[in-house]
Amino acid sequence: MRHLLDFQDVNKNHLENLIEKTRSLEFKSENIDSLALLKFDEPSTRTRLSFAIAAEKLGIKTFESSDVISAKQKGEILKHEIETYISMGIEILVLRTKENNIDDYREFKDIGVISAGFGNKSHPTQALIDISTLFSLNKINEKLTPITYIGDVKHSRVFESGRQLLNLLGFKVGVFTDKNLLPENKNDLEIYESWDEVFESSNAIELLRVQKERLQDNEEINFDEYINNYQLTQEILGKSQSDLAVLHPMPINIGIEISKDAIDDRKIKYKDQLSHAIPSRIAAFKYLRDEI
């Protein structure tokens, strides 16, 4: 069975079909009659709920688990864990984890694995949401960088998957952030030094929260300085183009990446992203079943 761990093994045709399915906003009920395990080892609201609803729409029965209540607490290895799921008829594993051992899951052939957020490595269905939103808002322009990510790109799986997806479509992405939050791999990136450069080069931006839970002991962030330089405020929005689209994968930390006076501006499009949440997860399930 296929996996959707990231976009490494997804060809351009399949990727375009995934985007089209996500853009369609379809909620058509089906009766696939399959079993899926939603294993979330990190907190989640939108991702977990939208996967559960998407499965329900497709007739996929879901069960839930996490490392806290699994035999991993007793030392069970991954191979035995997956063999157990397969023996019980689980065909799809939807996994959210803080770990980065994504390649270990590529080896499994009798169960399809979807990344619902994999360490700082991948979050493919969120990337589908974000880029589908941009297409729906007509923000993909070959003359411009489709999107500039602002904030903690170093630790962001949303950034990594968005970058990978857009690279497959032939685009570079922009970055505007503190030097300590730049990714190690800077290939195919446009690195901007000011808000003015961002607005001159992109039709859309995506704000990313500082991932405090992933900061290492040797990574220090001066939050006062960060907020002063990279927080999106109403004043800064007023200097942007009238048709700018501002995305955010959520949860939003008001007062850090965006000010309270800016959150309700008409340019803020997180509600458009939310409308694509269930369709993106429907698309992921269908991709695993070779229906896309």
Label every PLM stretch briefly:
Residues 58, 108-110, 169, 187, ...:
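Short, structured coil segments at secondary-structure junctions
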Residues 32-135, 254:
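Phosphate/diphosphate ligand-binding glycine-rich loop within oxidoreductases
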Residues 186-261:
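Rossmann-like adenosine-cofactor binding region
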Residues 41-56, 135-209:
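Glycine-rich phosphate/diphosphate-binding loop of Rossmann-like nucleotide-binding domains
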Residues 30-36, 143-147, 243:
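Phosphate-coordination loops involved in phosphoryl transfer and adenosine-cofactor binding
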